[in-house]
Amino acid sequence: MKKKSCTKRIIAIATAIIITIASIFVYINIKPVSVDYGMSELYTQQDMDSAIELIKESINSRKGCKLYSLSYAGDNLSSKELDYCNSLERSEELFTECIVFDSCFRSPIFGGGGWNANSLYYWNWYLARTDDGPWQLVSWGYA
């Protein structure tokens, strides 16, 4: 009789652990991206949102990665990095605007493809455009 009671207790504990882990996994994966627009005299929230969409698309194309947060790096850095953005592109037309975001995202749970398994990455994203045109993602990675 004691053996059945012990087995039931073990099954109940194992089930509770599995449900807890599954709940945490679901919460992490459905948690919305936190966006900090900061203060800008250069860009509207709409300008930033269109740039953010490109960043989200890039993260989502990296199978298994989960974006947690994006923060506008500020007007000073964005203005300062315009020359850097222009140095990266082989376009006939120079960019007139640059916007920089900081991010935090998690790599795939099991890693692979150059990722460390289930690790947080803190990358910068550089986007540029010409005369209020569409943003182009020109650089990303560690600062």
Regions found by a protein language model. Give the residues of each.
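Flexible low-complexity loop/turn motifs enriched in small/helix-breaking residues
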Residues: K2-S119
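Short beta-strand edge/turn micro-motifs at domain boundaries
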Residues: L120-A143
